[in-house]
Amino acid sequence: MRTLMIHSDYLRYKTRSKTKIAEDIDDEKRVSGVDEALVAFIAVEKEDEENPELIINKAVKEILNVQNKVNAENIVIYPYAHLSSSLSNPDIAQKILKGIEAELLDNNEAVLRVPFGWYKSFELSCKGHPLSELSRTITTEPEEESEDSEEEPSEPSKMFILEEDGNIFDVEEYNYKNKTLRQLVDHEEGKTKDTGKQPPHVRLMREKELASNEPAADVGHIRWYPKGKLVKDLLSDYVYQLVTQRGAMPVETPVMYDLANPAIREHAEKFGERQYRLKTKHRELMLRFACCFGAFRILADSFLTWKNMPVGIYELSTFSFRFERQGEVVGLKRLRAFTMPDFHSVCLNDDHAREVFANQVDMCAQTETDLDVHYEVAFRVTQDFFDENEDWIKEVVKNNIKKPVLLEVIPKMKHYWNAKVDFAAIDDLGRPIENPTVQMDIQSAKRFGITYLDENEEQQYPTILHCSPTGSIERVICSLLEKTSTDKGNKPSLPLWLAPTQVRIIPVTDNHLDYAKEIYQQIRDSNIRVDIDDTAERVGKKIRNAGKEWIPYTIVVGDNEVENNSISVNRRVDNTKEEISIEDLAEEIHTLTKDMPFRQLPLPYMVSKRVKFD
């Protein structure tokens, strides 16, 4: 169910004509209205048919919760199919809407239910305060009980700020130098408020023709357009380059695993995320949420010795799956299917693991520079690990992270790790986008039977590190798009090496097109992504269109350029214009994109030939 709740001064409606699914109504319901109301526009979805009673109960609870916050005198139930592309059967939709009305009436609320299946004109006045417009997604998933509901309440974590000089402060007493670290702390403490607003990247990913949701698939499954696929592939190439330079060996493993395997089931339960599960005639299977299962199975079947250490296994999981709550799925930030770079390192022991861990934190920190994003960092450890390794933790913050971090000390181990570092960008709404991570795993080697032969030819269980140098590729793109909203004062852009079109050539008229094509070929041969705007638009409109596409360099070709065999380049980053040779332009771009991967433009180079997506 999708709802849009508007706190209004009044709502007035008038029925105009009926559809074939319209309910029968009395004359008094053809024209009506109410003052001082919470108007709940509702679309009942296909998924709601699984459990109408639960949907009714949850919808009523949500409506009453919002009504209580805004102190509305009346409630309006307004059927509004336009909120969803996956509508339920009309009979069930009516049943659910009437059920919501009945339950609200049972709560002694003043309720107006607008007729179902009629074309209507309506007039509404929104009050305009911060809570006057709220959207909600209500699902058939039952509300979860706490993992510790049958146990003693768990002791909460302790939160500190650890600075580079080793000083530790209480999070409430710390003098924050930047707001994003404070925002990370607020989120961890549950203080971040849900504004009901959509993150900017959701609009931008469609507007820039990168990606959009696939309505014919499950929620949280994305379709990628050519520009977005290019950016996604370049990021995948980047991570491959990053990890193989550090000795990782690429592998590929299945996406589906048998939960009858005790090690796989136990690890899945330890991970804690919701999973896609399916049953065949004789098996219960799970779609992987990361590459751990396949990597550990390979390592368990391999002959490892102390001379091999550290052993690195890398896989780009082009499809990882987590069955996130439907209401939590948003844009590229939280998905049910995503692309996860997964790097596992087998280390001799805990001492060796700490050394490799610090190096991998370095690698994760490097991505902050290469991607031109800003990360805040959370260093999470168990109390036992902190007591034994406090000095080492401070060294990592000083030498590898090099800025203040949120230090979370957990009373006891809940998962498979006893230490991990999480890097997170902060979105335009002040919420973290979890990106790179490094985790120290002290359980999986024994669980999966991974051993190595030490110097005395005795079998030992290693310590294993989990590392995703960037986090999911989708979240990287999410972070890049969100940065364009948070980075006030600068023109929005992607890093030059990720820009789908790096240079656009704009001929003034068709008479200049041949020269534009000559320039195009020279630039393309220099391994730079370039295209030509040969559309019938005026030059000013073409330049504005290039700006809307965030193209870093534009070259306008007119009579002067043709006569003098020259080019004049406009740089988006600083709005400068310069007459420059093609060789110097290529050198400038190659210098700015040094060591970054490159792919050619996967689109027609003539803009007039392109398809308009989404």
Swiss-Prot record:
Please list the cofactors this protein needs: Zn(2+)
Location of this chain's protein in the cell: Cytoplasm
Q: Which domain of life is it from?
A: Archaea
Q: What is its main location?
A: cytoplasm
GO CC, sorted alphabetically, is: cytoplasm
Instruction: List, alphabetically, the InterPro entries matched.
Output: aa-tRNA-synt_IIb, aa-tRNA-synth_II, aa-tRNA-synth_II/BPL/LPL, Anticodon-bd, Anticodon-bd_dom_sf, DTD-like_sf, Thr-tRNA-ligase_IIa, Threonyl-tRNA_syn_edit_dom_arc
Report the record's Gene Ontology biological process terms.
threonyl-tRNA aminoacylation
Residue ranges of the region described as Editing domain: 1-138
Recorded protein name is Threonine--tRNA ligase
